[in-house]
Amino acid sequence: LNRKRGRALTEADLDQLPDEPLGDHVLTLRIAEVVAETDDARSLVFAVPDGPDDPQIPPARLRYSPGQFLTLRVPSERTGSVARCYSLCSSPFTDEALTVTVKRTADGYASNWLCDHAHPGMHIHVLAPSGTFVPKTLDDDFLLLAAGSGITPIMSICKSALSEGSGQVTVIYANRDENSVIFCDALRELSGKYPDRLTVLHWLESLQGLPSAAALAKLAAPFTDRPVFICGPGPFMEAARVALETLKVPAAQVHIEVFKSLESDPFAAVKIDDAADEDDAGPATAVVELDGETYTVSWPRSAKLLDVLLAKGLDAPFSCREGHCGACAVTLRGGKVSMEVNDVLEQQDLDEGLILACQAHPETDSVEVTYDD
């Protein structure tokens, strides 16, 4: 997708845009409520459309884990649409509706459009919840570091851990000033409900300046034995990373959520060119475990595994389709693959057999993978 910023479309403009062919993996949700969290942040509460002409969405397609995100398709006059990922602030354990929070940014076309034009009753295309910024267990003690709208997935993890887990939760939350604190009331209510388990430490730049690595290290020092989840602007996450390195927190304990702008269109219909393999060894065979079922599919060597699965109608998880986010990660059980791009898996992940389905090509005649580990 072209990321140049065009003028913001009004709702009256939408009917004038040409329809883009969308894949069968695309879902349509209805905005049930828009909540003004701060002057520049809005929460979008979604509902499943239930009109007679609305397609049915199986509940499993909207099942999610704390810390995951939705990818939204936002209309654009210049490009037809842009795709943006927004973390779910809702908890699958305490909230009935999926909810994302969008903070307006100065040069962000999508965030400005959503803050200006999203309203109850509006329908919007999304991809199924995805992402790997997810605790392995909710019974751990947690250290959660957030800045600005980075509180969104942190809030989901916090609410879920308090509701379903048994450990201590510490949130370190940095903002520009008191008026820019998203979920201020909700955090206060949670602190009152769980006074012996939740500690929220606020950092206000207007009073304390920018949070440095040294300052964050001092705040985090009592909690170095916990899993750490970090989300926020780049400089904040870098300061937090340095702080944890200074404290010698093992890298395996540290989880960082990073979103990148998407260059391709993850909403587009997937096309597989079977003829492309005519001059080589022919297609490989993939045996795929997904949601408790086992599927055997023909895998053209020129095609990526995710594209093959989507073209077959399988509900494989993904988001960016560019090798950046890790949402499509799957465990390789047998055979060999090559990946075009890998911007997210570290050597430890590769050693454990993880691959990116959106970038994987077969190197052997048979490949076995599982999404169910």
Provide a role label for each language-model segment.
Residues A281-R321:
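C-terminal accessory/binding modules appended to enzymatic or scaffolding proteins
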Residues N112-E278, G282-V287:
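FNR/FR-type flavoprotein reductase catalytic core
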Residues S206, H361-D373:
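Short flanking/linker segments adjacent to small metal-binding domains or redox-active Cys/His motifs
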Residues T10-H123, D140-D141, N175-E178, R188, ...:
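Ferredoxin-reductase
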Residues P153, L310, L314-M339, D349-T364:
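Local cysteine-cluster metal-coordination motifs and their immediate loop/turn environment
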